[in-house]
Each structure stands twice: as C-alpha cells, then as structure tokens.
C-alpha cells in the first residue's frame, strides 16, 4: 500500500527489527519529529518478524493506516481541506476526511546496504512536504540523493514543478544527486496511441 507518512528505512545496531510509529496527533504540538525521537515513549512500536513474509506484510501495512476525522480536527493538525480534492483532502458524503494515523515512521531492518549506513526516506507526496517543514528545511537539503517520482499517466503538474523548483532542485539546494523518475510508464501503451504519440508524450514530460 502507498506510504501515508514520511518513512525512514534504516538499520540501527543493538535494536531489534521493528517499526516505530509517531501518532499524527503530535502535530498539534510545537515539537519536531527530531525532538520526538528523544522520547521513545511517544512512539508506538510494532515488532518485525523477518523470518515470516506474512508477519512482515502485516506489520508494514501499519504504516499506511488511515482514519476518518472531522474537517476541523484535520485542519488543526495542518491538513489542507479542498472540496475538489486537488490541493487538499476531499470531504466525503458525511463531511469527514481521511488522514494518516501516523506522522512519521522509522523502520529498523537488517539489510547489508542499510547496515553500511544507507538511510532511505520515503515521503507520501506533496501534502507531507507542505505539512512537515523538517522535510524541506533539513532532511531534503541534506540528502545525498533524491528520487523525484512522477506518474507518467497523469503528467507533470504545476504542483510537481513547484516542489521540484523550490525544494528539490532549486538554486539554493545542491544540484548533484537529484533525479526525476517517470513511473507507470507502461500505462501509456494503451493500444490507442501510436508509438510516435507515446514517444512525444514521454518527451513532453521529460
């Protein structure tokens, strides 16, 4: 399932494989995620059984958990609400919106690359970048590499371009290690468009 909160994948020796989840309600405080990392009691811990694929799947699914809340509650937590859902959360027929259950997740997983110090930060998209200043002010600028993944079937939007320009590859950020990736490119071969039309669409987005 799609990641619903910023998720760090790393390996920390001396700690068992586990997922640490920071409740979304912590957004109502002035404390940053980095500050909450000093208070382990604020996090929910889910053990990872690396010997069982089913157990791993069940545990990792927790990262994508959502819940329905009142619009006022979502707004207090920093979520934008939009009737059309283009630039924010779209209310349902009952006037409620779906928000992620967790503000941040840290997955401690034993893997040779992670054991060498690699840390992967997966963000759920534009909403997280706007709602969590740490991503734009600290974590993204200091990253050695950023993969900016775009959906080829929907095209590059103005919001995508703004994030790329302002937070990923702008004049005030490092230029090396910034890579844009077109995902879902296989969906362009729909049996209707010609090869030339598909090539033109890819070239336009690139």
Tell where the protein language model's regions lie, with residue ranges.
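Globular "head" domains of long coiled-coil molecular machines
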Residues: 1-206
